[in-house]
């Protein structure tokens, strides 16, 4: 019997949290995945460390926030093949990945587009 949408979303969430812990060194405090047509949206909350939070708030120029954001995005881009493989192992073929993070809310959004709609 094929997995339900909810089961697949839970598996993706579990795999993404594991990736964050093992590759990035710290997991999110909250995570949720949504499968929407030909997209997978992953929302990770609580991803910024205390040290990064202090750096981000140390000056008003925004330089600390920019450094954190730039390094976090670069790290995720380097890990793109691993993330695509995680999804492939769960039965999805991701054709692109888009990401952004908010230092202010300590939240990352990852959007994967798939080769066809989920059904």
What would you call each of these model-derived segments?
Residues 1-119:
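Interaction-mediating elements
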């Amino acid at each position: 019997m094929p997995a339900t949408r909810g089961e697949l979303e839970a598996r993706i969430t579990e795999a993404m949290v594991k990736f964050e812990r093992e590759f990035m060194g710290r997991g999110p405090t909250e995570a949720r995945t949504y499968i929407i047509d030909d997209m997978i949206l992953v929302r990770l909350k609580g991803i910024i460390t205390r040290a990064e939070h202090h750096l981000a708030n140390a000056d008003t120029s925004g330089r600390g926030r920019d450094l954190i954001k730039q390094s976090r995005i670069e790290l995720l881009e380097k890990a793109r093949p691993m993330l695509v493989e995680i999804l492939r192992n769960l039965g999805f073929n991701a054709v692109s990945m888009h990401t952004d993070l908010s230092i202010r809310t300590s939240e990352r959004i990852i959007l994967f587009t798939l080769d066809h709609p989920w059904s």
